[in-house]
């Protein structure tokens, strides 16, 4: 037998960016909304989520927003493009989606993109390790030591 409704209840995360159905359901029920994408995606989809929230009388700030982005350090534009191409091939993404979703470049370029993500209302970032370079631990260590501290409150 299932237990009665628990208080506090486990939080519900809804992932996806479907503008008519998924975001409407997230506006009604989610504690947390997650989608693959960067600043462009989160700004656009976030506006639509806000509209759905208004329709159901919910404060959109009640929903934690998070993004999934692919991390890669690169010293030049060619390196960034290699990371984007790898993402496109592996995930079947087009070039525009890759430019938005891939968090790649120098430390300052990655920080700049994260600042835009934060400005879009994102409060949490997921970095899938299965898409990291061969040196997964090195990339994560570098991210945590050189980038993350600037975004921690």
Task: Please identify what each model-predicted range represents.
Residues 1-153:
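Active-site-adjacent structural elements that line small-molecule/cofactor binding pockets in enzymes
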